[in-house]
Curated annotation (Swiss-Prot):
This is Vesicle-associated protein 2-2. The chain crosses the membrane at residues 364-384. Belongs to the VAMP-associated protein (VAP) (TC 9.B.17) family. Residues 1-363 are cytoplasmic. GO terms for cellular component: endoplasmic reticulum membrane; extracellular region; plasma membrane. The modification Phosphoserine is found at residue 279. PANTHER family: VESICLE-ASSOCIATED MEMBRANE PROTEIN-ASSOCIATED PROTEIN, VESICLE-ASSOCIATED PROTEIN 2-2. Gene3D superfamilies: Immunoglobulins (2.60.40.10). It comes from the Eukaryota. Interacts with cowpea mosaic virus (CPMV) NTP-binding protein (NTB). It is a single-pass type IV membrane protein.
């Protein structure tokens, strides 16, 4: 396999140094082969970065993306030099392989597999060099407004577009557009307003699903009183000479973005659609619920297995107890039999002893018998002599 398995873009990960805020970088993997390719991402500082997802399978001639999130800096670094690196390991796998089937052994070189490794460097850039959205009044994203169409949806504040938000990423606060920037934009290009105006924006930067016009109607004087913004003149209407006013205040905090419908015109405030964020939050909640259900199911399965194992152990103990009872009863019977046999032996031994004593007594004549016989013989002899 001389041809590389994956084409990785970018080769250098750039992170903006921003205190107390997370920054992220998206890496795109392109499978240039006709095989399914599994990849795994490693880093030299796992506590500092979060990779989502860190493993995956890329289909032939397709692309896959993963996001690298850098944790927020607690204090500014002394220099902008970063020695952290990322290692992307990739290998060809079968078409049936899923993300759950990927293990560390798949990327082991001991089995003789072809493992491709690509290293990515990390560079730190100041926050000013990080990509930010341009003001809404620039010529590239300028829009033509019709006062007769937008008079009921006029806002008295100017807003900028927020950058797209990835999962687990903290989005930076949008930057307010000041008087100087608006004047410079007006001097650079004067916007003429026909009666039926449309909104022109760059499609390659933001799609139609990301931008919406407002549905609600606000009073411009009321909003100006509440926010305290200074009014600035932007464009004049060709018919009745009325000007669309947009206000901004560099010291005031940014309000939340306006929710604008697709089929209507824009006022001076344009905001990113919140539906993807809500859908992502719903997906996260659903994933958490499914994870909780899976965890509960696994816990229940473990509990059932433990109960079955306990039942098997109890049955084994009961069988052992029965065997012990049977052996104890056998031993008791043997003990009673042995005691009876012992008693019989003792009785026989006593009988043998009594028989031996009787035999010993009957050997010879008794002393009384001898005395009587001697006395009778003496009497008979005395009478015979006389």
């Amino acid at each position: 396999m001389n041809m590389p398995l994956l084409d990785i873009q970018p080769r250098t990960l750039q992170f903006a140094v921003d205190l107390k805020k997370q920054t992220s970088c998206v890496v795109q993997l392109t499978n240039t082969t006709h095989h399914y390719v599994a990849f795994k991402v490693k880093t030299t500082s796992p506590k500092k970065y979060c990779v989502r997802p860190n493993v995956g399978v890329v289909a032939p001639k397709s692309t896959c993306e993963f996001t690298v999130i850098m944790q927020a800096f607690k204090e500014p670094p002394p220099d902008m030099v970063c020695k952290d690196k990322f290692l992307i390991q990739s290998t060809a796998v079968s078409a049936e392989t899923t993300d759950e089937d990927i293990t560390a052994s798949m990327f082991s070189k001991a089995e003789g597999k072809h493992i491709e490794e690509n290293k990515l460097r990390v560079t730190l850039v100041p926050p000013s060099d990080s990509p930010e959205l341009s003001p809404i009044n620039t010529p590239k994203q300028g829009a033509v407004f019709e006062d007769s169409i937008l008079k009921d949806r006029l806002y008295s504040q100017s807003e900028t577009l927020a950058p797209p938000q990835y999962e687990g990423e903290i989005v930076k606060e949008p930057r307010m557009v000041g008087h100087d920037e608006l004047k410079a934009a007006d001097n650079a290009k004067e916007l003429k307003t026909p009666k039926m105006a449309t909104v022109d924006f760059v499609e390659d930067r933001y799609t139609a699903n990301d931008l919406k016009a407002t549905k609600d109607s606000y009073d411009s004087s009321r909003m100006a009183k509440e926010t305290g913004f200074d009014p600035i003149r932007s464009h004049k209407d060709a018919d009745d000479g009325r000007a669309i006013k947009a206000t901004t205040n560099l010291d005031a905090p940014m309000k939340k973005a306006m929710d604008l419908p697709r089929d209507q015109g824009f006022t001076n405030g344009i905001a990113v659609d919140s539906e993807p964020k809500i859908s992502k939050e719903r997906d996260v909640v659903q994933l958490q619920k499914t994870d909780g259900q899976n965890v509960r199911g696994l816990d229940e399965l473990k509990l059932v297995k433990d109960i079955e194992e306990m039942k098997l152990k109890v049955d084994a103990l009961e069988s052992k107890l029965k065997q012990a009872d049977s052996t104890i009863s056998k031993l008791m019977e043997e003990r009673s039999i042995s005691s009876q046999h012992r008693q019989s032996l003792q009785h026989e031994l006593a009988e043998l002893r009594t028989k031996k004593i009787v035999k010993e007594v009957h050997n010879g004549f008794p002393l009384l018998y001898v005395c009587v016989v001697a006395f009778i013989a003496y009497v008979i002899g005395h009478f015979l002599r006389t």
